[in-house]
Amino acid sequence: FCATTATIVSGAMAERTKFLSYCVYSGVISALVYPIEAHWIWGGGWLADMGFHDFAGSTAVHFVGGVTACLGAWMLGPRIGKYGKDGKARAIPGHNLTAMALGVFILWFCWFGFNGGSTVAMASDDAMVSAGLVCFNTNLAAALATVAALITSWVRYGKPDVSLTFNGALAGLVAITAGCDMVDPFGAAIIGIVAGVLCIFSVEFFDNVVKIDDPVGAVSVHCMNGMWGTIATGLFSTSEGLLYGHGFRFFGVQVLGVICVAAWVLVSMTVIFTIIKKTIGLRVTEKEEIDGLDIHEHGLTSAYSGFSISDPTYAEMSVNENTDLGEDDITMASEAKINAAVKVVKEEPLPAELDSGMHKVVMICLLYTSPSPRDRSLS
């Protein structure tokens, strides 16, 4: 759980954070921030004594990681090229939806251990029934969150957005984690549906209003839905929930717990990020960000087997290999072919002393022609 809290932060701060800084703040989260708030919630602390309930970590793990991610991304600033001169967000899509899908389904499967395993023991019939309810609610919330995110993106952007749908699945898993043992399937369904919709609007809000650059949507998935799931437990708990006629006390304790944990994380991590920024530095240089952190931070040409980085300086090309559209017949081509074509321009060789890294980046950008529906709406 502690490791999960620390790794959530890396997604929102991706592509521009120094690796050493990542190691330092992850160590501080693991050694200081997480243990204190986890003690408040699970270790017989004051929130536990008040009756605060977080079964498997919507607040203790996901909300803490999400708040830290939001703060870190804000202090880092956006990636180069994320926002134009007019302030509008530009799409920087992920490189591999297949890998994303695989990762989501691995997480979904492992969440049965994350939530179901938090039952700790199955020595009695009651414990086994409880674990069964936990796993059922977990799967139901995730499935309905996925459908809700898909439909919401379809309605808003004209086509279903794959990446947002996957994030919706994770949002449902995060949200149900707090109360999966206290809510019935109806409550789990509502929690999941709201989580899927909330994830979509949250991504838009942070991209376009707050202008916090979160490459993977970690803040929307973990912070916003960790908060929603914890508060929703106060609403839908069959034994103590507000909507089941048990009054405001439990609901109020859930809200208070979220506020106090957020305050602790914001104060402690603001101090830590500020110290890192003033000493070893939090962000890489502009050149390192453009070239890629694989090269400068880890000494790798590329971390992705699907990418082959080569220097095109001396390449001889006369036609567009993608559309077979050369310079001579571009005037007769259809609008669709012109839009799809990558213009080939013969140039003199670059000077030997000029770093070709920028040239590679330009080539990669030119070859990108098909944004997702959400990305088109942001462009």
Predicted region positions:
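Conserved small/polar residues in nucleotide/adenosyl-binding loops
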Residues: 368-375
